[in-house]
Design a protein with these regions (language model features):
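Chalcogenol-based redox active-site neighborhoods
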Residues: 1-187
Length: 187
């Protein structure tokens, strides 16, 4: 089932962020763009590489007015230790959200019940709390966060230019398309 153009459902979770335990709710996502990046579990193999990639691009997300949230089915306590012990995860300046009850992973359709883990899911959410992009895939395939950033910027662009669309491989500053009858069959 697609979650595109649906509202994020109410939730409450604990996260490790900037050396503290903090609460994250659906209200935390409102008023700014948000990127939720679901991962299977702390202390695994691909997950730290993705967190490091997100950390390397974090300034760009912030410049775009977006916050990044990493979500696993672990507790916020595990995230604290993971942040303190993994050189890659230690670079994270964004919230590491715990979902031990699987409420978030179920709400976003990425829970693997038989494993108690999450699939690799990425969701871009607009400031009103509406899901604008989603991508879910096998846990053996890590994501390229630069592509997530590109999708965020495309979602932001079409939100502020509703009569235009971003074509394949579109990057910020490049030409978009204005759908019209005159374009039909000409692309």
């Amino acid at each position: 089932m697609s979650l595109i153009n649906t509202q994020v459902q109410p939730f409450k979770a604990q996260a490790f962020h900037n050396g503290k335990f903090v609460e994250v709710t659906e209200a935390s996502l409102k008023g700014k763009w948000s990127v939720l990046i679901f991962m299977p579990a702390a202390f695994t193999f691909n997950c730290p590489t993705e967190i490091e990639d997100a950390a390397d691009h974090y300034a760009e997300f912030q410049k775009a007015g977006a916050e990044v949230y990493i979500v696993t089915t672990d507790t916020h306590f595990s995230h604290k230790v993971w942040h303190e012990t993994s050189p890659a995860v230690g670079k994270a300046q964004f919230p590491l959200v715990g979902d031990p009850t699987h409420a978030l992973t179920n709400a976003f359709g990425v829970h693997i019940p038989e494993a108690g883990l999450a699939l690799r899911g990425t969701f871009v959410i607009d400031p009103s709390g509406t899901i604008k992009t989603m991508e879910v895939h096998d846990n053996a395939i890590a994501r390229d966060v630069a592509e997530t950033l590109r999708k965020l910027k495309a979602a932001q662009y079409v939100a502020s230019h509703p009569s235009e669309v971003c074509p394949a491989k579109w990057k910020e500053g490049e030409k978009t398309l204005a759908p019209s009858i005159d374009l039909v069959g000409k692309i």
